[in-house]
C-alpha cells in the first residue's frame, strides 16, 4: 500500500507537466488506442522542430485549477489503481496536488510552496518535506519553474494525430530522470489527455475536467502548514 501511494505521488509530479498545456473545461474519453511513443513517426507525424501545442502554451500560463481522473496500470496493462484528484498551479514553482483513491483511504496531498515540497499521507499521519529544487530536479515538474530552458531539459516532439487528438511526446534529456516519456493529447489548443510511463513500464492515464486557467488562486491554496499531531520527516528550507 505504501509503495502504491508513492507511485501516485511520483505520477502526480509528472502530471504537473500538463499544467504547461492549453486548457479548457472538459476532457476526452479514455481510449486504449493512444499512439505508442515508438510509433511517433510516419505520414501522420509532423516534422520534428515544428512548434507543438505544448510549445505555444508554455509562454502564457500563469495559474491553473483543475480536477482529474487517473488510472494506473502495471507493465502488463493490468489496472492497479484508480483515483480522482485536484490540481492547483501558480507559476513559477508553486502547486497543490491532492488525490483520493477509489475505495478505502483518505488520500494524499502534495504542496510545493516555492521553497519546499511537502507530502502529507493522511492514513499514516505523516508529512515528508524536502527542498523543492532537490525533490523536483529529475522530474517534469521542473517545467513549473518558468526559468529553465525547457528544450535543454525535455525533448518535445510532435507525435502525430490519432483518435481526433494531436499528440506531443515529452522525453527527459538526462538519464537521471525517473520517467521514460509522457504523451499529451490536444484537441486544437485544448489539452484533453495525458499518458505517462515510468522506467518500470507502469503507466498513468489522466483526463481532466472542470478546468479554470489563469484564474485567481489565493496564497494559502499553495502554502502548507503541518496539521497538529502529525510526524514530520525532513527539515524545511526557510
Regions found by a protein language model. Name each.
Residues 1-8:
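N-terminal secretory signal peptides that target proteins for export/translocation
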Residues 12-23:
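Bacterial N-terminal signal peptides
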Residues 17, 26-82, 90, 226-238:
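N-terminal leader/targeting segments and the immediate start of mature chains
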Residues 58, 136-151:
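Short, solvent-exposed helix-to-loop capping segments enriched in aromatics
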Residues 61-63, 82-84, 90-92, 105-107, ...:
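Extracytoplasmic
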Residues 86-138, 204-205:
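An acidic-aromatic
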Residues 128, 149-238:
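Gly/Pro-enriched, hydrophobic low-complexity segments
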